[in-house]
Amino acid sequence: RQDGIPGSLHYWYNDSHEFRDYQVKIVKDFKRVIDYLETRSDIDSRKLAYYGFSWGGILGNLIPAVEKRIKIAIINAGGLKMYKGKPKPEVDYINYVSRVTIPTLMLHGRYDANVSYDNAAKPMFDLIGTQEKDKKLIVYETDHIIPHKELIKESLDWLDLYFGPVGR
């Protein structure tokens, strides 16, 4: 993005109005994308999935909680908190994560130094409001980057499980 927002607002919670406004802007932008996808005859808007990697995975606490047109979430190297101060309640992910109730697959590296497994990913997984049978956490003996073959296989299997195989 070339929006003039300092890089620190992209990754770290803080209690500023700027951080709050940026989070609201991200959600509005995401909703506009879905509005557009719904106008396309070549897109089945009943089968929209959220995929987030790293900071996009962290946004998986918020976007699937407030955008009900998303039916599945795949979170890669995401987690619940990366604090530098306490965010305003209206954008504190702890207030949203339990509202994520769609089937959710999380993939995470046990040795991720960017988004801690123990302090961010596991707490997010435990607090997601999705029924146990519809959420899955796979932990790899890696760092922030999941091996691509496993990532692709698990993601496609998850999409096929809930959306069915892609028609040919």
Which role fits each region the language model picked out?
Residues 74, 105-107, 138:
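Conserved hydrophobic packing residues within short motifs/helices of P-loop NTPase cores
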Residues 97-101, 127-131:
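Short, conserved loop/helix-junction motifs that constitute active-site signature segments
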Residues 28-96:
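Primarily recognizes the serine-hydrolase "nucleophile elbow" in alpha/beta-hydrolase
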Residues 94, 117-122, 153:
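Short, surface-exposed alpha-helical segments at coil->helix boundaries
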Residues 100, 106-108, 112:
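Short beta-strand/loop motif that positions the catalytic acidic residue
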